[in-house]
Curated annotation (Swiss-Prot):
The gene is rpsL. Signal peptide: none annotated. It comes from Mannheimia succiniciproducens (strain KCTC 0769BP / MBEL55E). With S4 and S5 plays an important role in translational accuracy. Interacts with and stabilizes bases of the 16S rRNA that are involved in tRNA selection in the A site and with the mRNA backbone. Located at the interface of the 30S and 50S subunits, it traverses the body of the 30S subunit contacting proteins on the other side and probably holding the rRNA structure together. The combined cluster of proteins S8, S12 and S17 appears to hold together the shoulder and platform of the 30S subunit. This is Small ribosomal subunit protein uS12. GO terms for biological process: translation. One of its GO terms (molecular function) is tRNA binding. GO terms for cellular component: small ribosomal subunit. Part of the 30S ribosomal subunit. Contacts proteins S8 and S17. May interact with IF1 in the 30S initiation complex. Pfam families: Ribosom_S12_S23.
Amino acid sequence: MATINQLVRKPRVKKVVKSNVPALQACPQKRGVCTRVYTTTPKKPNSALRKVCRIRLTNGFEVTSYIGGEGHNLQEHSVVLIRGGRVKDLPGVRYHTVRGALDCAGVKDRKQGRSKYGVKRPKA
């Protein structure tokens, strides 16, 4: 426990919390334009072709975002919404595209977990 005199001389230092998603600038989502849509391979021990896109955000940042779900309709110049959330086996991918918002369509024929993939409730 520090004495009052010690605290007067050198006050306690607040810990600075570093953001995991700096490009969002404390916003829940951001809009951007796809500059490149491509696939990439995950790091060991996983193996796949993960769908990702490079996005220029409205605030000028350029980020890589993961496209979740089976199949997508994104191409260059598509306008998308991104949210935070990294992909553990893709280094440098710290954002997810929001399915079913702006130019990004929802996942076709999705029956369960629909809200995460932008799919409306199917007709009975």
